[in-house]
């Protein structure tokens, strides 16, 4: 494998990893039946004259399978944390208990599970589109190098095959991540 090809594949791998990481973040925000700190980490709280991430005003814990707690560091922000979680659109109903905000995770209805599975499917399709876009960039770079005379037609074939193989690996990983997320969502 030529150094240029290795450099190109490393760049494409890095960019495809970015698409996978983005999918992981999207999936973390999808509520399943189990409690996970990632569910409420993106919530922003009105505090100190602006909006700050929940993780900057308290620590999130999972004391039980269907319960999250937020230990708020500044007692004056307990109400703001409770409001932010309630208004987050996640369908959660937090309750303040001293400096702790308890967040019970309700059982998902079958209809809601279906919606979440469809949303997960959309997220995975977006990740596949991103991976295919990276593949297209790689193929374009390969063809441009051939036009400049830097590589032969045989090299173009070898590089294109390597890029396609890399793309197939990432699409397979995305499908595996989707299957795992759907199992998690459907689990009662």
UniProtKB/Swiss-Prot annotation:
InterPro entries: Ribosome_recyc_fac, Ribosome_recyc_fac_dom, RRF_sf. One of its GO terms (molecular function) is ribosomal large subunit binding. The keyword Phosphoprotein does not apply. The keyword Oxidoreductase does not apply. CDD domains: RRF (cd00520). One of its GO terms (biological process) is cytoplasmic translational termination. Keywords: Cytoplasm, Protein biosynthesis. It is found in: Cytoplasm. GO terms for cellular component: cytosol. It comes from the Bacteria. Pfam families: RRF. NCBIfam families: frr. Belongs to the RRF family. Responsible for the release of ribosomes from messenger RNA at the termination of protein biosynthesis. May increase the efficiency of translation by recycling ribosomes from one round of translation to another. PANTHER family: MITOCHONDRIAL RIBOSOME RECYCLING FACTOR PSEUDO 1, RIBOSOME RECYCLING FACTOR. HAMAP family: RRF (MF_00040). This is Ribosome-recycling factor. It comes from Gluconacetobacter diazotrophicus (strain ATCC 49037 / DSM 5601 / CCUG 37298 / CIP 103539 / LMG 7603 / PAl5).
């Amino acid at each position: 494998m030529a150094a240029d090809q290795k450099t190109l594949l490393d760049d494409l791998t890095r960019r495809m990893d970015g698409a996978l990481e983005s999918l992981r973040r999207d999936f973390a925000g999808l509520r399943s039946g189990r409690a996970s700190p990632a569910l409420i980490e993106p919530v922003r709280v009105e505090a100190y004259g602006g909006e700050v991430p929940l993780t900057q005003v308290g620590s999130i814990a999972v004391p039980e399978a269907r319960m999250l707690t937020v230990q708020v560091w500044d007692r004056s922000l307990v109400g703001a944390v409770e409001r932010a979680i309630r208004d987050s659109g996640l369908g959660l109903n937090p309750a303040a208990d001293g400096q702790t905000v308890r967040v019970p995770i309700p059982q998902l209805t079958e209809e809601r599970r279906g919606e979440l599975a469809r949303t997960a499917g959309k997220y995975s399709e977006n990740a596949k589109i991103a991976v295919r876009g990276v593949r297209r960039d790689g193929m374009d770079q390969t063809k441009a190098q051939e036009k400049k005379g830097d590589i032969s037609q045989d090299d173009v074939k070898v590089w294109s095959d390597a890029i396609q193989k890399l793309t197939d690996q990432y699409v397979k990983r995305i499908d595996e991540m989707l299957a795992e997320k759907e199992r998690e969502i459907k689990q009662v």
